[in-house]
Amino acid sequence: MGLLGELLLLPAAPLRGTAWVLRQVVAEAERQYYDPAAVQRELARLNELLEAGEIDEEEFDRREDELLDRLEKGPRQS
């Protein structure tokens, strides 16, 4: 795209920049959310809560399934 095209698209630059920033934020959030080390830490904490009696077996199973699903699925591929 030449100089003329760049000049015509200049008013949309803030929107393109905002969209790029949002894509970067989403990618980083997914990376942290699906990080196996973070999921393992949450599983360990969940086990501690169960052993301390702060949650019951049903709650433990539900939350454990959610965490294991996160490990299996991983971040969405784009």
UniProtKB/Swiss-Prot annotation:
Keywords for the protein's UniProt record, in alphabetical order: Gas vesicle
GO CC term, one of those recorded: gas vesicle
Subcellular location: Gas vesicle
Disulfide bonds: none
InterPro entries in alphabetical order: GvpG
Extra remark beyond the main annotation: This strain probably produces some gas vesicles from the probable gvpO-gvpA-gvpF-gvpG-gvpJ-gvpL-gvpS-gvpK operon; it can be induced to produce more under certain growth conditions.
Name this polypeptide is given: Gas vesicle protein G
Organism, as annotated: Streptomyces sp. (strain CB03234)
Lineage of origin: Bacteria, Bacillati, Actinomycetota, Actinomycetes, Kitasatosporales
